């Protein structure tokens, strides 16, 4: 790629964007099994932050796969690419001072490590939404676990593909001990001090 040249040095700095918005641009990377509550928690927190005057963007795995990543399958390589693209998009938002909440199963440690490397360690917070496989199967609002059990979905995390739990996440939220609203409040209380220092 000798014909490509970065123009990042010509752009407005992240710190200037943050001053304008009066907030810190960070990424909350929500990881957990399908049906663990990632998207529900993200939406709650985004709405709560909006009422306080914070600019946020939720990047939901399903929505991303219906758009920019619709050409990707659920193979190991495509899952990695799904994470890579989402992380690159998140970085663009974060560099504009926007609080970005990514909701992806991202089942492997190396996938989440890649996301952190792209977004930047100081801007990346890994949030583990800890929900048992049993509870996720009981919820199964999309019917995906039933399909996976019948063999209709290949490489489905938790059934035919493993999930590697984060060993040292920035925050571990157990939905067994807390319902969705309580879990959302835990995340809200965690993120508020991180983004408020310019106010």
What do these predicted ranges mean?
Residues 1-27:
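Extreme N-terminal, non-catalytic leader segments
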Residues 34:
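The conserved Walker
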Residues 130-186, 194-199:
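Small-molecule kinase domains that catalyze NTP-dependent phosphoryl transfer to phosphate-bearing small molecules
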Residues 25-27, 55, 99-101:
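Residue-level preference for the first positions of well-ordered beta-strands
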Residues 67-74, 78, 90-149, 155:
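ATP-dependent NMP and nucleoside kinases share a basic, alpha-helical "lid"
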Residues 43-88:
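Conserved substrate/cofactor phosphate-moiety recognition/catalytic segment
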Residues 30:
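Hydrophobic anchor at the beta1->P-loop junction of P-loop NTPases
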Residues 38:
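Conserved lysine of the Walker
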């Amino acid at each position: 790629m000798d014909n490509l040249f970065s123009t990042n040095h010509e752009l407005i700095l992240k710190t200037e964007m943050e001053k304008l918005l009066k907030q810190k641009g960070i990424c909350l990377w929500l990881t957990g099994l399908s049906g663990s509550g990632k998207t529900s928690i993200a939406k709650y927190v985004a709405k709560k932050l909006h009422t306080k005057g914070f600019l946020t963007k939720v990047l939901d795995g399903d929505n991303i796969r219906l758009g920019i990543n619709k050409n990707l399958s659920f193979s190991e390589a495509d899952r990695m690419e799904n994470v890579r693209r989402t992380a690159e998009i998140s970085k663009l938002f974060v560099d504009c001072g926007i609080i970005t909440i990514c909701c992806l199963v991202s089942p492997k440690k190396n996938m989440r490590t890649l996301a952190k490397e792209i977004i930047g360690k100081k801007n990346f917070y890994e949030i583990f939404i800890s929900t048992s496989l049993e509870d996720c199967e009981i919820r199964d609002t999309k019917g995906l676990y039933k399909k996976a059990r019948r063999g209709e979905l290949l490489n489905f995390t938790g059934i035919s593909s493993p999930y590697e739990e984060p060993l040292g996440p920035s925050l571990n939220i157990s939905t067994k001990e807390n319902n969705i609203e309580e879990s959302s409040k835990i995340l809200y209380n965690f993120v508020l001090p991180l983004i408020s220092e310019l106010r």
